[in-house]
Swiss-Prot record:
NCBIfam families: S16. Keywords: Ribonucleoprotein, Ribosomal protein. The gene is rpsP. This is Small ribosomal subunit protein bS16. HAMAP family: Ribosomal_bS16. InterPro entries: Ribosomal_bS16, Ribosomal_bS16_CS, Ribosomal_bS16_dom_sf. GO terms for cellular component: cytoplasm; small ribosomal subunit. GO terms for molecular function: structural constituent of ribosome. The keyword Ribosomal protein applies. Belongs to the bacterial ribosomal protein bS16 family. Pfam families: Ribosomal_S16 (PF00886).
């Protein structure tokens, strides 16, 4: 089973709010998920990112692959270090 760390959209139309979740790659964007790792609110200024760093690192150690957007959010929040090279 391929596991991804990705964004699940919530909130009203035109007012997005995202949960950072660990889910099977085959499940729908807003469908079933295995674990919730954090939240992302792009509407606040500056954008609000809350991540449970311990949970995120645990899932990354287990082999979960973050999507590009989640990888950027994890770097901003300090969970992932910048890769040089």
């Amino acid at each position: 089973m391929a596991v991804k760390i990705r964004l699940a959209r919530h909130g009203a139309k035109g007012k997005p709010f995202y949960r950072i979740v660990v889910a099977d790659a085959r499940s729908p964007r807003d469908g079933k998920f295995i674990d919730r790792v954090g939240t992302y609110d792009p509407r606040k200024e500056p954008s609000e990112i809350k991540v449970d760093a311990e949970k995120a690192r645990e899932w990354l150690r287990k082999g979960a692959q973050p999507t590009d957007q989640v990888r950027n959010l994890l770097r901003i929040s300090g969970v992932l270090e910048e890769q040089k090279g």
